[in-house]
């Protein structure tokens, strides 16, 4: 079970200065990288392809951020929070370390 999943709200804690402290929703998790909506945008140069109907040009898209550079956002406290795991009745779940509340 991963500490950060798709749909979680996270805060960027390290990396480029323009991204630090920003908050966003996780769009995808791939290996050790997360893609966060609207954060860490890069310019990608796209070649035109008339067969697929793709226009060429410069396109903005989100790049991945290493999973160690983000922390889960706790809406109850309004701060970032660590994630722990517990097993109750044979079911493993995530919880916030500061409040002890269950995440999912």
UniProtKB/Swiss-Prot annotation:
Show the SUPFAM superfamilies listed in the entry. Translation proteins SH3-like domain
Pfam families to which the protein is assigned, alphabetical: ribosomal_L24
Domain of life assignment? Bacteria
**Which terms does the record give in the GO molecular function aspect?**
rRNA binding; structural constituent of ribosome
What's this protein's family per the entry?
Answer: Belongs to the universal ribosomal protein uL24 family.
Identify the HAMAP family for this entry: Ribosomal_uL24_B (MF_01326_B)
Q: What quaternary arrangement does the UniProt entry report?
A: Part of the 50S ribosomal subunit.
Q: What does this protein do?
A: One of two assembly initiator proteins, it binds directly to the 5'-end of the 23S rRNA, where it nucleates assembly of the 50S subunit. One of the proteins that surrounds the polypeptide exit tunnel on the outside of the subunit.
Q: Quote the protein name from its UniProt record.
A: Large ribosomal subunit protein uL24
* Taxonomic lineage from the root: Bacteria, Pseudomonadati, Pseudomonadota, Gammaproteobacteria, Cardiobacteriales
